[in-house]
Amino acid sequence: MTKQYIVIGAGILGASAALHLALNKAQVTVIDRNDAGKATNVAAGIISPWLSQRRNKAWYFLAKKGAAYYPQLIEKLAELGEFDTGYAQVGALHIHSEEKRIEQILALADKRKAEAPEIGETRKLSVEEITKMFPYITEPMRAAYASGGARVDGRKVTQSMKNAAIKLDAKYIEGDAALQVEDGKVIGVMVDGIVIEADEIIVTTGAWGNETLQPLKLDMQVKPQKAQILELQLESEKTEHLPVVMAPSTLYMLAFEEGRLMVGTTHEDDKGFDMRPTIGAAHEMAEKAFQIAPDLREAQLSELKVGFRPVVPNAIPVIGRLPQFSNVLVANGLGSSGLTVGPYLGKELAALAQGLATEIDVDNYQLTNVIRHEK
């Protein structure tokens, strides 16, 4: 009898897991309740982990693999007729006011190139070169450039993966899935009063992960981190080829087609699922942007987006089977790396669910670090 798989949560991670299961001819049902504030839907992602100052090797392995996997994923999606992914390799600018910091970033890039040739060309840019590449930056700054940097629209690439999975006979249900336990074993889920049975259940519900596991009397240490992002409309609509920009103080800017410019972001802990966009966050992000790109004061404010990143205590994603319920797999805690890591980790999660070899060492991302029995 053919194994049945259920994926609960169709953000970028769950959509990827479903797609890769479907690519391997598995029978998959994807269930998502489409919560307001899901991280994937508001995320505009910069794919350029190689110049990050984060030193954790387990995190960097995932981020490096995630960035390298994107071209293969985009090719697979195109083969399945999905072209509107919001992904483009446009290069990345790492901006700083201090020359010394730029030299440190480039030295790190040179060290990492051997294992990550997808970094592409790296070099230091003059003030004039920066303005030529990204005309809105008019203040004198220094920059390290990596030609392999890319940007992606979280909503679009996730929708493309869902569409592709459905074309491969995956089923999609919008609804609230509750895990069902019989005789100490998870037999499936209940959605709208109907029980759907499965052999393997994958839980990828992000910031809502703890809620999903409540029927199992387990407590997952994952919390929502509120992110707010400005979406601006520029007069020039020829913006799709502008490089992504990363600057100090968690400022980033990335442009899409037709003059859309995203400016982010905030990292707000202990706000719960507060969906309100706040003037304080808008002011904070705008002021940071104006310091390097003062002409953005004349841009039109289109929207202030709000979403919730799933964060775990040590900020390293977790993946694995629940020790107490071996047919339930969980992956979570991608934080602000979700768009870089999500598609690749979803592929690995699908392999794990099917008993196939994984590239990652799951011991480096132990689920047991964040799971506790409820008292």
Positions of predicted regions on the chain:
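Active-site substrate-recognition segment that forms the wall
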Residues: 16-24, 31-33, 46, 82-87, ...
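Helix-loop-beta segment of a Rossmann-like dinucleotide-binding subdomain
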Residues: 82-94, 111, 118-168, 266-270, ...
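Dinucleotide-binding Rossmann-like beta1-alpha1 core, especially the glycine-rich loop
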Residues: 46-129, 288-290
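A conserved short coil-to-beta-strand element within the FAD-binding core of flavoproteins
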Residues: 150, 171-187
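Beta1/beta-strand and adjacent pyrophosphate-binding region of the FAD-binding site
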Residues: 1-11
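C-terminal catalytic lobe of FAD-dependent flavoproteins
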Residues: 295-375
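Short beta-strand to alpha-helix junction loop
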Residues: 61-65, 95-104, 144-163, 276-281, ...
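Short hydrophobic core segments
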Residues: 6-8, 196-208, 346
